[in-house]
From Swiss-Prot:
<dbReference type="GO" id="GO:0003735">
    <property type="term" value="F:structural constituent of ribosome"/>
</dbReference>
<dbReference type="InterPro" id="IPR018265">
    <property type="entry name" value="Ribosomal_bL35_CS"/>
</dbReference>
<dbReference type="InterPro" id="IPR001706">
    <property type="entry name" value="Ribosomal_bL35"/>
</dbReference>
<feature type="compositionally biased region" description="Basic residues">
    <location>
        <begin position="1"/>
        <end position="16"/>
    </location>
</feature>
<dbReference type="GO" id="GO:0006412">
    <property type="term" value="P:translation"/>
</dbReference>
<dbReference type="InterPro" id="IPR037229">
    <property type="entry name" value="Ribosomal_bL35_sf"/>
</dbReference>
<keyword id="KW-0689">Ribosomal protein</keyword>
<comment type="similarity">
    <text>Belongs to the bacterial ribosomal protein bL35 family.</text>
</comment>
<feature type="region of interest" description="Disordered">
    <location>
        <begin position="1"/>
        <end position="24"/>
    </location>
</feature>
<dbReference type="InterPro" id="IPR021137">
    <property type="entry name" value="Ribosomal_bL35-like"/>
</dbReference>
<dbReference type="GO" id="GO:0022625">
    <property type="term" value="C:cytosolic large ribosomal subunit"/>
</dbReference>
<dbReference type="Pfam" id="PF01632">
    <property type="entry name" value="Ribosomal_L35p"/>
</dbReference>
<protein>
    <recommendedName>
        <fullName>Large ribosomal subunit protein bL35</fullName>
    </recommendedName>
</protein>
<keyword id="KW-0687">Ribonucleoprotein</keyword>
């Protein structure tokens, strides 16, 4: 059986942490930000963990990550 390929789109967007969680960037931070308050933009900074309900999808997209 050949190896499963990693999804290139997931490779670019997610990083697996040593504890097995996956971190991702926040959405809604690309354009049309003038109507968004400074507080909203500040809360969208940085990275957050992928929710546990989506970890099954992560395991399929990143088969070599050991999730």
């Amino acid at each position: 059986m050949p190896k499963m390929k990693t999804k290139s789109s997931a490779k670019k967007r997610f990083r697996v942490r040593p504890g097995g969680t996956v971190k991702r960037g926040q959405a809604f931070k690309r354009h049309i930000l003038t109507k968004m308050t400074t507080r909203n933009k500040r809360h969208l900074r940085g990275t957050v963990a992928v929710h546990e309900t989506n970890m099954g999808s992560m395991a399929q997209m990143l088969p070599g990550a050991g999730l």
